[in-house]
Amino acid sequence: MALFNFFSKDKKESLDKGLEKTKQSFFNKLARSVVGKSKVDAEVLDNLEEVLITSDVGVETTLKIIDKIEERVARDKVLGVDELNAILKAEITSLLEESNSSDTVGFEIPVHPEGPHVIMVVGVNGVGKTTTIGKLAHQFKQAGKKVVLGASDTFRAAAVDQLIIWSERVGVPIVQQGMNADPASVAFDALQSAKAQNADVVIIDTAGRLHNKVNLMNELTKIKRVMDKVIPGAPHEILLVLDGSTGQNAFEQAKQFSVATDINALAITKLDGTAKGGVVIGISDQMKIPVKYIGVGEGMEDLQPFNRVEFVDSLFS
């Protein structure tokens, strides 16, 4: 039985399948690290440290996990290697709980008296940002929400075109002014349009030009300021999209975007095509930003609300 009603059997199977490469890689390394050992000793812990780091969990998070296991060894005196999986599972779940105080439940959104819920989406080109917006729009629509898209990534013509294609595919309206338009002006129009249509949620795409952080910071600050004038408190959510298959590069992007603007949610995509799923654990722990969605496949439904218990369950099943 699923631990949460909203987490259907289909979604759990999709999650299991999406994390298969990460799981196989992790447990193959783990099995090799304890071969010939009956209890957890210094050598096993050294090997485990290497397994976690090479699984893209990250050095700082790995050391936190190792410290916890060392405490357990010191307390219990003798710890069998057969107990290692259960202890690791518990420690990783606990780490994720610190950053994800409450799991994302389905595709529900808060209600604001001033107007629709506004999500500003940020991320570099190639991480699956536009696809994530399209899948979010689809799932919000499936949940009975009225959605409006705003094409404020006006730096690339392809970005606007891609978002138009997604709006047509999903069947939701889009506000766009084409390439080189003022991004803040597009966001302003999108929010005005959404209010006029009594929309429930507005999703604003933005340009992700990390090579010029000052320009990016100024642009995002201007977009936020303009949106706040239309709907006080907007954007309510600044969602950073990261490509999980890039491993530690995703972590570096998260750090850089956190300098550029106040990120308060993460979407980690492309986990199905990689063995680097451990990056979810490291980014969540180090950045202290909730992981809200994970991408575990190509399908429209394969952008899933992140559930820490189900995620760890799939890794250790």
Which positions does each model-derived feature cover?
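Non-catalytic terminal/linker segments enriched in charged/polar, low-complexity residues
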Residues: 1-120, 138, 142, 146-149, ...
